[in-house]
Amino acid sequence: MARHSELVKIPRLDRYVSKLALGSAPLGGLFSEVTDLEAEETILAAVNSGINFFDTAPLYGHGNAEKRLGAALNKSQKPYVISTKVGRVLKKFTPEEVAGKVDGLAAYVGVDPTIFPVFDFSKAGILKSLEDSLQRLNISSIDIALIHDADDQIDQAIAESYPVLDDLRSQGIIKGIGVGMNFCSYATKAVKQMDLDIILIAGRFTLLDQSAQDELFKEC
């Protein structure tokens, strides 16, 4: 077995995932346009190489990445684990209303210019985000829900987002809870104050920046 496809267990989920996951931000058209066929071929190539763990979010392509990921995995007919994210809800705006909004809009190419992601860490926002993701992915349940980019709103995420996710986990509606963060200090606070199954930290464990190893990993 190739190292990228070696499996590790996420304990409470009782699921084994490949050590290497496929992130789907580029499949949503991050910085350059991606066709449905290109996205499908990429996802199926990952599946055929032994990868079974796929990460997505409503932000990625403003829903396009989730739609493409769900369609391709449905074609593959192989078992998989999906993590998607909560904390943003996609809303419809007029072009005039969208003008001046910057949260990810300029980064994604080929998206509907009237659909825009809006931060919402409230209970209602979390439930709406999950409901919409289930529809876009065309699946009946979510393996892992990650609270997304709550670095500047970590207190609200702890007080409002986490309790509803914990309740859904206890009901079996979602299997695992995590955070997808950008800064170690906020992720560390999340680890200390929430009962999490998994942590995604962006850009803090690379060749250039290994701050997660010194700060966050010690708490995991």
Over which residues does each language-model region extend?
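Short glycine/proline- and acidic residue-enriched helix-loop micro-motifs
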Residues: 108-119
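Structural preference for beta-strand elements that scaffold enzyme active sites
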Residues: 17-21, 52-53, 79-83, 141-146, ...
